[in-house]
């Protein structure tokens, strides 16, 4: 028997995978782990992808050092 699920396929590095799994608990979508770098977001739609992208961008901005951020 074949099962079809609507969702999104996501390829990412392992730390990003862990962050997406963390976000899934807050945003209420199901994550199916396929392997170390691939996830399937069941029930995910464009709204979910935009939310994930925004949260990842925020995390990267917090963890990026810039010489220009330093107070002079």
Curated annotation (Swiss-Prot):
Q: Does the keyword DNA damage apply?
A: yes
Keyword line: DNA damage, DNA repair, Nucleus, Transcription, Transcription regulation
Cellular compartments annotated: Nucleus
Q: Name one GO cellular component term.
A: transcription factor TFIIH holo complex
Q: Where are the transmembrane segments?
A: none
Q: Which GO terms describe its biological process?
A: nucleotide-excision repair, preincision complex assembly; transcription by RNA polymerase II; transcription initiation at RNA polymerase II promoter
Give the residue range of the signal peptide.
none
What domain of life does the UniProt record list for this protein's source? Eukaryota
The keyword Transcription regulation is annotated on this UniProt entry: yes
Where this protein primarily resides, as one coarse class? Answer: nucleus
What does the subunit section of this Swiss-Prot or TrEMBL entry state? Component of the 7-subunit TFIIH core complex composed of XPB/repB, XPD/repD, gtf2h1, gtf2h2, gtf2h3, gtf2h4 and gtf2h5, which is active in NER. The core complex associates with the 3-subunit CDK-activating kinase (CAK) module composed of cycH/cyclin H, cdk7 and mnat1 to form the 10-subunit holoenzyme (holo-TFIIH) active in transcription.
Relate the protein's function as given in its record. Answer: Component of the general transcription and DNA repair factor IIH (TFIIH) core complex, which is involved in general and transcription-coupled nucleotide excision repair (NER) of damaged DNA and, when complexed to CAK, in RNA transcription by RNA polymerase II. In NER, TFIIH acts by opening DNA around the lesion to allow the excision of the damaged oligonucleotide and its replacement by a new DNA fragment. In transcription, TFIIH has an essential role in transcription initiation.
* Similarity field: Belongs to the TFB5 family.
By its UniProt entry, which PANTHER family does this protein fall under?
GENERAL TRANSCRIPTION FACTOR IIH SUBUNIT 5
Report what the protein is called. General transcription factor IIH subunit 5
Give the gene symbol.
gtf2h5
